[in-house]
């Protein structure tokens, strides 16, 4: 299978190339916090020679409770992203939830993300495809890896083949997620070698059946990330926070920001090792 290369500016993304880090914060809580977190990521990834794309949401439109914090919104969010790009020279990924958001967001950021809950919404897919931007498709928790080729085909029919696929776990009964390590290769195959990345943060989510917010298993982030990267992936998607207990969204799954460097040292070592192995075809 030939591995497809998708370029985010000058950053090549492919399953057989050194992994790209898609990292940042869950939601833009404030301009100052975004600057602080982005600067830390940039410093560490430059030190470790890891290609880097900053991640944050400007609007969490799918919160469980109507009272939960959603973010600064489109206009203010784009202003913050523009300042981050100007200050740090960083590439940015963010998600869109409605078709009318696609073009104004693509005018500012480098990658637009199709949320897992919306990944089969054809009108949204078509609007995103028309922008010509690089697309990151989150695999829905309720969709099998083998079905992801259909979503990629929608983008291709819409004139955009610059697609990255991202796994964030699959439903395992009620209110729990598991990650099928065999599914990564299935997604590579059905997408004809498109880059596949792993969202370890949201794969750690779990829920109180009667609660209004997600819980998480932050203490297992290193083990799960190691396992995923051992498969041989194009990138890792992770969120970090200086004070996870007081984060406005998904704090229980967020990596403590001060653990980012030792965490990435381990992930890079695994990625370097795996991608130096010769390809071994055991299907025959």
From Swiss-Prot:
Pfam hit, one: DAHP_synth_1
Entry keyword Transferase: yes
Biological or metabolic pathway of the protein: Carbohydrate biosynthesis; 3-deoxy-D-manno-octulosonate biosynthesis; 3-deoxy-D-manno-octulosonate from D-ribulose 5-phosphate: step 2/3; Bacterial outer membrane biogenesis; lipopolysaccharide biosynthesis
CC terms in the record's Gene Ontology section: cytoplasm
UniProt keyword terms in alphabetical order: Cytoplasm, Lipopolysaccharide biosynthesis, Transferase
GO biological process, one term: keto-3-deoxy-D-manno-octulosonic acid biosynthetic process
Claim: Transferase is one of the keywords in the record: yes
Catalytic activity: D-arabinose 5-phosphate + phosphoenolpyruvate + H2O = 3-deoxy-alpha-D-manno-2-octulosonate-8-phosphate + phosphate
Subcellular location: Cytoplasm
EC numbers on record: 2.5.1.55
GO terms for MF: 3-deoxy-8-phosphooctulonate synthase activity
Family, as annotated: Belongs to the KdsA family.
Name this protein carries in UniProt: 2-dehydro-3-deoxyphosphooctonate aldolase
